[in-house]
From Swiss-Prot:
<dbReference type="Pfam" id="PF00501">
    <property type="entry name" value="AMP-binding"/>
</dbReference>
<comment type="function">
    <text>Non-canonical nonribosomal peptide synthetase; part of the gene cluster that mediates the biosynthesis of the alkaloid (-)-FR901483, a potent immunosuppressant that shows efficacy in animal models and a probable inhibitor of purine nucleotide biosynthesis by targeting phosphoribosylpyrophosphate amidotransferase (PPAT). Within the pathway, FrzA catalyzes the reduction of L-tyrosine via its C-terminal reductase domain to produce L-tyrosinal. The biosynthesis of (-)-FR901483 starts with the condensation of two L-tyrosines to yield (S,S)-dityrosyl-piperazine.</text>
</comment>
<comment type="pathway">
    <text>Secondary metabolite biosynthesis.</text>
</comment>
<dbReference type="InterPro" id="IPR000873">
    <property type="entry name" value="AMP-dep_synth/lig_dom"/>
</dbReference>
<keyword id="KW-0596">Phosphopantetheine</keyword>
<dbReference type="InterPro" id="IPR010080">
    <property type="entry name" value="Thioester_reductase-like_dom"/>
</dbReference>
<feature type="domain" description="Thioester reductase (TE)">
    <location>
        <begin position="655"/>
        <end position="898"/>
    </location>
</feature>
<keyword id="KW-0511">Multifunctional enzyme</keyword>
<protein>
    <recommendedName>
        <fullName>Non-canonical nonribosomal peptide synthetase FrzA</fullName>
        <ecNumber>1.2.1.101</ecNumber>
    </recommendedName>
</protein>
<dbReference type="Pfam" id="PF07993">
    <property type="entry name" value="NAD_binding_4"/>
</dbReference>
<dbReference type="InterPro" id="IPR045851">
    <property type="entry name" value="AMP-bd_C_sf"/>
</dbReference>
<dbReference type="InterPro" id="IPR042099">
    <property type="entry name" value="ANL_N_sf"/>
</dbReference>
<feature type="modified residue" description="O-(pantetheine 4'-phosphoryl)serine">
    <location>
        <position position="571"/>
    </location>
</feature>
<dbReference type="InterPro" id="IPR036736">
    <property type="entry name" value="ACP-like_sf"/>
</dbReference>
<keyword id="KW-0597">Phosphoprotein</keyword>
<keyword id="KW-0436">Ligase</keyword>
<keyword id="KW-0560">Oxidoreductase</keyword>
Amino acid sequence: MPSHTFNPQAGYDLAVDRNLGLGEIFYNRAQKSHQAIAVCDGGAVLTYGQLHAKAYRLAQELSQWLRLTEKPVGIVVQHGMADVVAQMAVIYAGGSCAPMDPTLPDNQIQGRLKRLDAVCVLTDQANRHRDLGADVLCIDDFDIADLAPEDTLYPVATNLEHCAYLIHTSGTTAEPKAVQIAARSILHVAFYAPLEPVYDTDVVAHANNSSFDVSLFDIWVPLLRGAQIAVINKAVLLDPPMMAREIDRLGITVMATTTAVLNLAAFIYPKAFAKLRLVTIGGEAANVAAIRIILKNGPPAMLFNAYGPTECCVFCLAHQITPADVEHGSIGVSIGKPVGRTITYIAGDEGGESDQGELWIGGPGVSPGYFRQPEKNLAAFSDLGEAMTSLENPVRFYRTGDIVRRRPNGALEYVGRRDHQVKVRGFRIELEAVEAGLLKTGLFSDAVAMRIEMPQNGAGSILAAYVVPTDVSKPPTMDEALESAKSILPHYMVPQLELVPRLPLNRHLKVDRKQLAELFGRRWEDVSPAQPENASQDVRSALVSLWATVLASPLSTYGDDDDFLHLGGTSLQAAMLINQIRHKFDIEVSLLTLYDNTTLGALTSIIKQRLSGQSETLHNEKDSWVADSEIADDLSCPLDRPIDWCRDTEGRVFLTGGTGFVGAFLLADLLHMPQTSQVRCLVRATDAAVGQERLRAALDKYGLWEDGFADKLVAIAGLLEDDYLGMGREQFEEAASWASVVFHLGARVNYAQPYSLHRASNTLGTRNMVRFACAGRTKAIHYVSSIGCFGPTGSILGTTSVREDEPLLPHITALPYDHGYAQSQWVADALLRRLMDRGFPIAIYRPGFIVGHSQTGACNPDDFLSRLIDACREIGCYPQLPNQRKEFVPVDYVNAAILHIAASPASLGHAYHIVPPTRAVSIDMDNSMALVDRAGNSPMRPVSYKEWVERLAATSPKRLLPLQPMLAERVKDGLTRWELYENMPVYETTNTARALQNYPGGLQFPVLDTSLMKRYLDFLEAKG
């Protein structure tokens, strides 16, 4: 640190008043620091004087092309000293630098240079022979003396409005936009970098590719401040131990890098940045876990999280990261407050400024606009007119397209994007970029890309495109079209293609996308897979075709080891594949068989076995379930009495499953309780901030969120299946000592998937929650299971009643006939039952099928009942299921019972059935569907289960599609899993009734009648 202090405001104001261009400012610095080192690249060194001389000499050569200032000059050189020299030379000559990534193919660089109308391109020896489509000046051809002539020809006099750079950024078309960067923007970064100045004693890493705007920090901040540049190449950057050695060897003190590089270092060599004075990260959301590791293992003196689109020049917002930002339970790292003279404006949805909305950036960092794209400039840049009447002079603002939220301390928090993009299979895709890429193949004269929901084939959202062949009389084959598209577009942007002679137009003479989507849907409806002529010999090729169809993939071949799930297959697509296999080969194959044979080779073998007459055997894993129920037997029973969590000094709740339907309502009830001081929720999320967003979204979904909740609610990013719940040992132990009680509702719930896929979250997760409850202070664990843990015990075993505390082992015989989720419930319940018998402080709650809130009607639109209702109303019938009850219980009744029972220490050591209190108020399935018929005014007729399944198969309602194979599969005596739930036993409620005796005023059970059903239907219809 220099002995003198630096006032960036005064220095910036003085530089602005002088209004000198970047070349002149550097020239003045070079005169003062002639012998000081400017650039160090490996063993090569340039002083300020030598850099001036080289720039001067190259500027002389450039003068034959640069008759006017601000003419674009391409730069294609290797990363290092050469790109610093080349850029300074262009600035000296009065041109505009257009640096290109040398790893780009020639045709892409040609296209960019042509659109810029570049006068020439500077290269080094490594790139001089490339076909770049412009006059080439190789910087290695000149023997440049150490000293430049003493004249004033170069640098050419410019000013702060000079367009110094043209930096390309991706946009809504396949052609990237060239962003103009003015000298004033770079000057602003140099004086506010980003909140802490760079001093003349600093050594700044040049680690960023010069085609990215962050490299302007690497180069111009040190050169304008009299500091030194030290080049670090990409290979070193991606090897954290080597990077640390280079930082030490070169004496680097300042570094701007990406979040990804910091994340890499955190998990490989977290001390990599320890010797740096200042580190700035950006480019994507800060990773809280990685930053926490860095801060605990030799952090830099200052670490900043910075934000700035290219259009705002490097950094416009920044936040100095402290340990408090990444403490467990924090809301995450903000993108900070405005840097220097930057101004922000948050435009709300209703107009006017808001604390949440789209971010606009104003100030000296904002670009003059996109090069020769006036229409895009009008859309992206504005002075905001009347919204900014408080400003003395008009200020140019850039519309970022980012949604932010202002925190109470004024810092901004990144929320998401708002622009013309879609998300398909996890990838954000710009449709116009897909269309432009298809047109670049030359095979098509027109193209329209779209995301399409596929209710017919269960592929979920797919990327599709309608294309018009350039030569309609001789269209390309599909393989030709796809291969050409894949040569231009990334794999995730290659759409499923449909060739048409012309695109339909709507009455406004625009492409009718709606009509195209409907046409695409009809095209899939018309597909009727044909039986292969020799199915036993052609199984593999037929299966390949089905995979390509169901995965909505343009791939035409798969290998035997390719895995359906690894290729992105969802449960919805798995159901679709099974249906297609059944129809294609006329065989019976279960969904569980697919999950056990997910590779192409294995599934092909299974199909051949079925075709040869081998029948499918029942998937029976009873020995595994019993063994898994014993995996917590090694835990030591706590000797201390559990904490009374409702005591005045306690009230600290640890909750899992808070983003689920029941969990969200229980969370809201806990937050309302005066005894609750804080609730920490374990959430499957990348970091705490995302977890907090997920919790709020879950509460919002059911109309439960209240602003006052924020003070008592803390999200913890974690994983149930991890021994330390994904928190790490230190935070696990801290949270275990903090908590007063544990409510465990978190689970994986998928009726179509086998036990093996539920085991990690539901079995291992339950064991880990017991470990957590026993760690630190002894805490009670309240586990929410369901009556489904007994399986179809009535039909299989003839069970007529089930006591709450009776052993579960006898009922295991019924579980092979149920789904994997129910099997995991049996295992988790049995695991806890074994521990309860040893004295562990545990209570188990087994509700029936939980339906919506009895007062608000808020219910789960994604549960089985909601999907069933939608499907039955769509096809106009429902299945007759005599003597079958789901034991429907409203969520508010369930949670009121749980919280009342859990408040008493005497509740521990028992299980509680939370079902309708008498048989008279328990509605069977037939009467329930009749209620839907009456309440929804949607005529439905009862039909046999067989006919209902056939109607489902014929119409394939989207909402039930993932479950169709399970609903149709016969598992015993010609009956399906659902049919086996007839003759359900009575679930006795002795413990529950006794525990609820002292409920204030008595806990009334809301009977499911027409008015309550109408409330549920109204809520579902409002949710769409």
